Amino acid sequence: MRLLSDLDIAKKKVGLRLDLNVPIKEGVVADDTRILASLETLNYLIKAEAKIVILSHLGRPKEGTFDDQLSLRPVVSHLSNELGISISLINSMKEFHDTNAQICMLENIRFFEGESKNSDSLAREIGAHIDVYVFDAFGTSHRKQASTYGAIKVAPFSCAGFLVQR
């Protein structure tokens, strides 16, 4: 797999798969170790003025069903505070395709039908609407799912982020 530092990602739309599966207690991130581990890659992309769409999962929701207890909303809030910038939470693939935000996060990828089965259609939904797919979800690298495997094959370019590179 190529490395992030090998690609020109300046001003490109980047899909960034992270492992932000962190414990949430009373709506607040209880342990931000995984969030902090993602900052090197995120800061690199921000400095390059890439348009970043973050993908991650939280827990094990019933696929295709929204569960407010497993929403990434607290993660977005915590990450926004860490970076000192606003991050919007988007809830649909249409928003994923259409977004022009500097940085946003797609709601829990496991809410989307086809993630765990490595659905070709979900992988295409992810990979076809970005310029570069950066995989930096070391904790999920063993899973053959749409966002951890399929999208890498579909995206025009894909590479490892700094956490996976290490």
Please provide the spans of the model-predicted regions.
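Active-site loop-to-helix "anion-binding N-cap" substructures in soluble metabolic enzymes
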Residues: 1-166
